[in-house]
């Protein structure tokens, strides 16, 4: 990270804080492709990876400004073999390179803006699991919640205009505008198999989307008092807190005139706001009538000030006591636990019924089994099946792959209140691994386990217990109690692919 900062600061100082020349630097694409910095950045290596060739990048960017020749024709005899076979390769290259440049540049600005300020910076808050302790502490005292799907911009120019306030380099903005206008259909149809944007190349769109969301997030005055729970200095693929701290100091002064009629909505001290990717949760202690006003305010707010068209039907008002939130791979709700207390005064006895609210998180077993079925670990009914593997893979490699998936799922879903569903998922993965090994050795599962022993699959059972036994080495009863309770880990920076079933 320090080497990347040094190179970016060097180039930006030479180019007067312009980002456009960085697009023609070969090492930018080497970093974007995770090739490291072990090559010289001053000389072009002819034998270097073709995908990161400086000459190819220059030729591709030149073609972007040729309006009638933006798409490379396969029948063009003047085109070399490389361009003829890879019509969409240059779009992926420029997307990765530009995303890397803006991410690292804005992260440097964020770090410099935080220097000298007394802002709590904890690496633990980079974990997405840190959201759930916040929900546990606050949501059990609230009544209503707005479950919102954030609308997407309908035109690429909206994203460019948002970035225009931060990037003063006109050439970079023109390049981004050309790129988005030509590939907007690919960006908004990311789920199509024929899309030229792979998961890796979606990071530019995610960066632009989060920068746009950050603009209207900063207007919410109530975040001024609650921002201590949301601070995160992570600068990975998603930068959601860029310039948030600088804007929050002048919120009331800038927006008081425009929102005089609606500022009373923000005076509720029990409003809490949580967002992850494209889903937003707004919870309050107020009545459903107040939340309904919030609902229509957000719709008009997005349309009038940010040109985002949202239907009121995409915003749901629910009671926390009788509704579960499908959020980040968990079903979260506030459960009412009644408790009977017997009180006696002299000769009279009383029974007092107390109700305690408890924040509950459950594992959505049906969608998760659907994800496992899609990944060919089981069928749609949850019955384990064998996965086809390469013949050159050893047994230890197969077990290690299954064990890694099982550990990741157990690690992420350790916060579930009830472990029964998690045990079922581990059982599916364990039996799927056994069937895969038996298929490789052309035998039945029973014969395979009898031959090699059931200890071959112990990795599925000992992963989590070993971690907890190191934490609580003395009392086995304490270990069992902790193992059955919710555990939130502070080292999870992304949601598991199988858990992200939405």
UniProtKB/Swiss-Prot annotation:
Instruction: Check the record and name the InterPro entries matching this protein.
Output: Domain_X, Maturase_MatK, Maturase_MatK_N
Q: Which UniProt keywords apply?
A: Chloroplast, mRNA processing, Plastid, RNA-binding, tRNA processing
Superkingdom in the source lineage: Eukaryota
Q: Which GO terms describe its biological process?
A: mRNA processing; RNA splicing; tRNA processing
Which is one GO molecular function term here? Answer: RNA binding
- GO cellular component labels: chloroplast
What family does this belong to?
Answer: Belongs to the intron maturase 2 family. MatK subfamily.
Described by its record, this protein's role is as follows: Usually encoded in the trnK tRNA gene intron. Probably assists in splicing its own and other chloroplast group II introns.
Protein name as annotated: Maturase K
């Amino acid at each position: 990270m320090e080497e990347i900062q040094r190179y970016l600061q060097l180039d930006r100082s030479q180019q007067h804080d312009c980002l456009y020349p960085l697009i023609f630097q070969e090492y930018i694409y080497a970093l974007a492709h995770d090739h490291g910095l072990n090559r010289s950045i001053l000389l072009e290596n002819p034998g270097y990876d073709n995908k990161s060739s400086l000459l190819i990048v220059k030729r591709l960017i030149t073609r972007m400004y040729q309006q009638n020749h933006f798409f490379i024709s396969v029948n063009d005899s003047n085109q070399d073999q490389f361009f003829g076979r890879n019509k969409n390769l240059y779009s992926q290259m420029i997307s990765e390179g530009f995303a890397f440049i803006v991410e690292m540049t804005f992260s440097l600005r964020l770090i410099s803006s935080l220097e000298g300020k007394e802002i709590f910076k904890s690496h633990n808050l980079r974990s997405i699991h840190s959201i759930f302790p916040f929900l546990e502490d606050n949501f059990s005292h609230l009544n209503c919640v707005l479950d919102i799907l954030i609308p997407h911009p309908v035109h690429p120019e909206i994203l460019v205009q948002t970035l225009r306030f931060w990037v003063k380099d006109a050439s970079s903005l023109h390049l981004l505008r050309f790129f988005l206008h030509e590939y907007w259909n690919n960006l908004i149809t990311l789920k199509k198999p024929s899309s030229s944007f792979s998961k890796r190349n979606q990071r530019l769109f995610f960066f632009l989307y989060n920068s746009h969301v950050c603009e209207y997030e900063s207007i919410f005055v109530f975040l001024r008092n609650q921002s201590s729970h949301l601070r995160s200095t992570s600068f990975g693929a998603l930068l959601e807190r860029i310039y948030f701290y600088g804007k929050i100091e002048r919120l009331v002064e800038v927006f008081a005139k425009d929102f005089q009629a609606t500022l009373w909505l923000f005076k509720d001290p029990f409003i809490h706001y949580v967002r992850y990717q494209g889903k937003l949760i707004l919870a309050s202690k107020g009545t459903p009538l107040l939340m309904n006003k919030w609902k229509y305010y957000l719709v008009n707010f997005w349309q009038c000030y940010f040109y985002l068209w949202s239907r009121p039907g995409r915003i749901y008002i629910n009671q926390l006591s009788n509704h579960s939130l499908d959020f980040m791979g968990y079903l979260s709700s506030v459960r009412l636990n009644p408790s009977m207390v017997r009180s006696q005064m002299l000769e009279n006895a009383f029974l007092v019924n107390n109700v305690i609210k408890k924040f509950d998180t459950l594992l959505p077993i049906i969608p998760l089994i659907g994800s496992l079925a899609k990944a060919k670990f089981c069928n749609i009914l949850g019955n384990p099946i064998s996965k086809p593997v390469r013949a050159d893979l050893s047994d230890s490699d197969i077990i290690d792959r299954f064990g890694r998936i099982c550990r990741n799922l157990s690690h992420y879903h350790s916060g579930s209140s009830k472990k029964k569903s998690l045990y079922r998922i581990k059982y599916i993965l364990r039996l799927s691994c056994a069937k895969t090994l038996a298929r490789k050795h052309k035998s039945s599962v029973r014969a395979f386990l009898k031959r090699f022993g059931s200890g071959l699959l112990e990795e599925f059972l000992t992963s989590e217990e070993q971690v907890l036994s190191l934490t609580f080495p003395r009392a086995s009863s304490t270990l069992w109690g902790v193992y059955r309770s919710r555990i939130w880990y502070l080292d999870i920076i992304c949601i598991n692919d199988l858990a992200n079933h939405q």
